[in-house]
Swiss-Prot record:
TM annotation in the entry: none
Cofactor(s) needed by this chain: Mg(2+)
Function, in words: Toxic component of a type II toxin-antitoxin (TA) system. An RNase. The cognate antitoxin is VapB14.
Residues holding Mg(2+): D6
GO molecular function per UniProt: metal ion binding; nuclease activity
InterPro entries in UniProt: PIN-like_dom_sf (IPR029060), Type_II_TA_system_RNase (IPR050556)
Domain PINc: 3-74
Record EC number: 3.1.-.-
Record keywords: Hydrolase, Magnesium, Metal-binding, Nuclease, Toxin-antitoxin system
Protein name as it appears in the record: Ribonuclease VapC14
SUPFAM superfamilies in the record: PIN domain-like (SSF88723)
Source taxon at top rank: Bacteria
Length: 103
């Protein structure tokens, strides 16, 4: 089965222990079955940029989470999107096939 995760679900997975039911569900579904749409990535990116203006320290944490977790899990590890995302991957210095995990 395939699941498309909404922005609030992806955000709920950011902090371990904050939303145990969401984390338990995500752990029960293989990462390969979890997807996000482009608008979800854009909404998260918009939130990170907004936080950069008001709280640079927190924005660093959010940026690292977005770049190291969200993009790696949902974009760079998916072979079908690699050709589209390759320029972004190179820009932020990713190895497209390194290991992934939520936390």
């Amino acid at each position: 089965m395939t699941y498309v995760l909404d922005t609030n679900v992806v955000s709920a997975l950011r902090v371990p222990g904050r939303h145990p039911a969401v984390a338990a569900w995500a752990d029960s579904v293989q990462v390969a079955e979890q997807f996000v749409v482009a608008i979800t990535l854009a909404e998260i990116e918009r939130g990170v940029i907004a936080k950069e203006r008001t709280d640079p320290t927190q924005s660093e944490h959010l940026r690292r989470w977005f770049d190291d977790k969200v993009l790696r899990i949902f974009v760079f590890a998916r072979r079908g999107t690699n050709l589209i995302m390759q320029p972004l991957a190179g820009h932020i210095g990713y190895s497209l096939y390194s290991g992934i995990s939520w936390f």
